[in-house]
Amino acid sequence: MSSSPNIGFISLGCPKNLVDSERILTELRSDGYNIISSYEGADLVIVNTCGFIDSAVQESLESIGEALENNGKVIVTGCLGAKENQIREIHPQVLEITGPHSYEAVMKHVHKYVPKPEYSPYTSLVPKQGIKLTPKHYAYLKISEGCDHRCTFCIIPSMRGDLDSRSIVHILDEAKRLVDAGVKEILVVSQDTSAYALDKKKENASKTVFWNGMPIKNDLITLCEKLGSLGAWVRLHYVYPYPHVDNLIPLMAEGKILPYLDIPLQHASPKILKMMKRPGSIERTLERIKKWREICPDLTLRSTFIVGFPGETEEDFQLLLDFLQEAQLDRVGCFKFSPVEGAVATDMEDQIPEEIKEERFHRFMQLQQKISAERLRQKIGRTLSVIIDEIDEEGIIGRTMADAPEIDGVVYVDNFSKVEVKLGQIINVTITNADEYDLWGEI
């Protein structure tokens, strides 16, 4: 039997794209290909691209160029792949280009240029949970593709299509495999998590689905309840502020899913929100936040905002700062508006000069850092559950229920030598200090 061919792989972009990469890698390994992390020795290189903002497009184009220069045989997939002409204009020598979540097309192209190897069908090449690019103790779980919203700053629907929710049975089966394989934290992702199954209402009304021998509804609340029964932390990301999101908060208060809500609000000026085609009642949002915290006092709220959107006046920006001050959000990300080819907002009048975007960005972050520092300071003296992400000679680094990997803060544990711990273990840590982003504590 000849040795298996090597496939190099580059994964760019968000966690949703990372899930696509994991799916492709699992398919490759199932077909007997070796996966390597270098260009040298690869029979072909796959680049899974991002195309959300111009800087991501540039990074993707540079990665394609690097792969071509160092290997020469390159297949491109992912969000930027939806703009084939843009890629061909700069890199005409790319072998094949597909759009996002085009798993079958990618595999077809791989087989064309690097024939499927022979291997023993009695040898399992893939773990039951599939190939994962995250540490063994946490994993991303994608519950749908695409989005039905048409936010004017975004081109995701043009690349990934309209909302297409996965079957609740398939999602729960995947989640159970992950937990059985040792995953301690499931991070639920999609373009629009709170829209899950809304596209399947008619279909779901006419049939009954079963999981573990019991009939279940195919909706977001049921999905969260069942995920919460598996024994792992369940964290929700990218939750659009629909009214039915209110129904998730009691599940968090009961401990069925983590008391953590990643809800991108984008702005606080009614005028700007209308121009963005986003929900515009900030007063209602503040009322909901107050109610959520009454129901679930330990709730962590994360959000993202855009400053420098076309037409944003100083008055609009001040409304955003006022909202931050009143809402007292726990975790906040801020982006300076970036024109994206194909986005409606790119062609709007009253584009904001870069120096004003920069100045507003710094004012925004300066205020939020003060808010974050105070909210974290309030945790000093409390004993919190912490999941361990890193262990080395200097100490332990972990995260509380309030911290998602990569985007939120961490907990540095000082006296770790007192007990034996391992990656993915959830331990109790007493918080002793805090800054604007991170915590320090002792076992």
Swiss-Prot record:
The keyword S-adenosyl-L-methionine applies. Its cofactor is [4Fe-4S] cluster. Residues 5-115 form the MTTase N-terminal domain. Residues 377-443 form the TRAM domain. It catalyses: L-aspartate(89)-[ribosomal protein uS12]-hydrogen + (sulfur carrier)-SH + AH2 + 2 S-adenosyl-L-methionine = 3-methylsulfanyl-L-aspartate(89)-[ribosomal protein uS12]-hydrogen + (sulfur carrier)-H + 5'-deoxyadenosine + L-methionine + A + S-adenosyl-L-homocysteine + 2 H(+). GO terms for cellular component: cytosol. Binds 2 [4Fe-4S] clusters. One cluster is coordinated with 3 cysteines and an exchangeable S-adenosyl-L-methionine. [4Fe-4S] cluster 1 binds at C14, C50, C79. Residues 133-374 form the Radical SAM core domain. GO terms for biological process: tRNA modification. Keywords: 4Fe-4S, Cytoplasm, Iron, Iron-sulfur, Metal-binding, S-adenosyl-L-methionine, Transferase. Coiled coil: none annotated. [4Fe-4S] cluster 2 binds at C147, C151, C154. Its EC number is 2.8.4.4. InterPro entries: Elp3/MiaA/NifB-like_rSAM, Methylthiotransferase, Methylthiotransferase_CS, Methylthiotransferase_N, Methylthiotransferase_N_sf, NA-bd_OB-fold, Ribosomal_uS12_MeSTrfase_RimO, rSAM. Its main location: cytoplasm. It comes from the Bacteria. GO terms for molecular function: 4 iron, 4 sulfur cluster binding; aspartic acid methylthiotransferase activity; metal ion binding; protein methylthiotransferase activity. Pfam families: Radical_SAM, TRAM_2, UPF0004. It is found in: Cytoplasm. HAMAP family: MTTase_RimO. Catalyzes the methylthiolation of an aspartic acid residue of ribosomal protein uS12. Belongs to the methylthiotransferase family. RimO subfamily. This is Ribosomal protein uS12 methylthiotransferase RimO. It comes from Histophilus somni (strain 2336) (Haemophilus somnus).
